[in-house]
UniProtKB/Swiss-Prot annotation:
Keyword annotations: Cytoplasm, Ribosome biogenesis
GO BP terms in the entry: maturation of SSU-rRNA
Species of provenance: Prochlorococcus marinus (strain MIT 9303)
Protein's name in the database: Ribosome-binding factor A
Subcellular location field: Cytoplasm
Start-end of Polar residues biased regions: 123-142
């Protein structure tokens, strides 16, 4: 099996098992303060390090507390991953906040605001494009 393929398989397994552990395994209350979604998992080529990218729904204070809880549980998570995946050495787990969903939402909001401005300007311009009665009579006389 090619090393790249193995790394991808291990990353997918880590994502699945970590999701399961987030729901049923981690008892730290900080982790359950916000809605946590695993967006991506990157594993190093030697399978010794693992970056887990998470999206956390909630206020900034909640996000930082949830991230602290996840970091505190990383040792437990590493042990469980090693046991569940039957790996000789489980990778070190590092959590990173993924702000991609947040950025996407802000872009969509900006696009919506632009659309509303266009509609407002379009209504104003269409009203100003209407010929006045003097212009209408002038056009009809020629």
């Amino acid at each position: 099996m090619a090393p790249g393929r193995r790394v991808e398989r291990v990353a997918a397994l880590i994502r699945r098992e970590t999701s399961e552990l987030l729901i049923h395994g981690i008892r730290d209350e900080r982790v359950h303060q916000g809605m946590v979604s695993i967006t991506n998992v990157e594993v190093s080529g030697d399978l010794q390090h693992c970056k887990i990218f998470v999206s956390i729904y909630g206020e900034e204070i909640q996000r930082s507390e949830v991230l602290e809880g996840l970091e505190a549980a990383s040792g437990f998570l590493r042990g469980e991953l090693g046991r569940r995946l039957q790996m000789r050495r489980a990778p070190e787990v590092h959590f990173h906040l993924d702000r991609g969903i947040e950025k996407g939402t802000s872009v969509l909001n900006l696009l919506e605001q632009l659309e509303q401005q266009r509609e407002t300007l379009g209504e104003v311009q269409s009203e100003s494009d209407q010929p006045t009665t003097d212009e209408t009579t002038t056009v009809n006389k020629t």
